[in-house]
Design a protein with these regions (language model features):
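Functional cation/ligand-contacting sites centered on basic and imidazole/sulfhydryl donors
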Residues: 1-158
């Protein structure tokens, strides 16, 4: 006969209890001593940096953490593109991106949006590629040195 597994409760998990939002969960009448670790109920959590979010108890037990600290969700003033990389956000093309703004996305977002450099070149690429250092393709093609130019410099230095 198979051995019966003993139920584990939220209160048995010290890491989850450290992030359990007592005030908000009490309002929902959630008791960590009654709710099991596999529960699909959405509880409130607060990470060590003070970010608050809702997630199922089961997903938290499986290892999901703060969506803001991990960059899965955008928190304006904390992990948004405008805050993380204002130099890149400065080239945001507000006209072509409509309602999308740099503070709506994390710097690691793979969303493809429009950009406009100081010379007026417009192009589309992902936010994370810009944050990783990819700049304006129009400006980079203007800066390319041709083989004959390299040859002239080489012979002049001899």
């Amino acid at each position: 006969m198979a051995e019966k597994k003993e139920k584990q409760y939220v209160s048995d998990n010290a890491q989850l209890m450290a992030e359990w939002d007592w005030k908000k969960n009490n309002e929902l009448q959630f008791n960590p001593e009654i709710l099991t670790l596999g529960s699909d109920k959405k509880a409130w959590w607060t990470c060590s940096k003070g970010h608050e979010w809702q997630a199922t108890i089961g997903s938290r037990h499986k290892g999901s953490g703060c969506p803001y600290c991990s960059g899965r969700k955008t928190l304006k003033g904390y992990n948004d593109l405008q805050t993380i990389n204002p130099a890149v956000a400065k080239e945001w093309n507000y006209e072509r991106n409509g309602d999308f703004k740099p503070e709506h996305f994390t710097a690691s977002s793979n969303k493809k949006v429009w950009w406009k450099c100081s010379k007026g070149h417009e192009w589309q690429t992902t936010i994370n590629s810009r944050n990783d250092g990819c700049g304006c393709p129009g400006c980079s093609s203007e800066r390319k040195t041709s083989f004959p130019e390299y040859a002239i410099v080489y012979y002049l230095k001899k």
